[in-house]
Amino acid sequence: GSWGAHVRGLNRLHQFDKVEIVQIENEKNSENALNEMCDYVESLIKSLEISYRKILLCAGDLGFASSITYDFEVFAPGQKRWLECSSVSNFKTYQSNRMNLKIKKNKDKVLAHTLNGSALALPRIVATILETHQNKNVFKALVN
């Protein structure tokens, strides 16, 4: 197990809430679907007015099933470090092949492309909002 200051509080919980986003697409729309999902996550983070970065994972850091993955990290100023809050991946046909998930293409049936991601990991987002939007112990109201 891990121990230390970097794994306490809202950073490492045994259970945490998040919203998953999923798309099932054909090969032609797969890349666009990934971009739409990334744009959605970015719009959520931007609306919270917190610093973030989008990282394209290298092949060595990808999960076994993933073809391409983008991680989103938010900066927690109180901790002076970046916290991963979202990960969006395209698995192409890896998952659909295992569950025989097919879609119609003309008169044929072909394997679908599956994409998924966590919209936002709530504890880390809450921690970052609290650290970013405080002003002399009075929290700014986030409007919108």
Regions found by a protein language model. Give the residues of each.
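TRNA-recognition modules of translation machinery and tRNA-sensing kinases, especially anticodon-binding
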Residues: 1-144
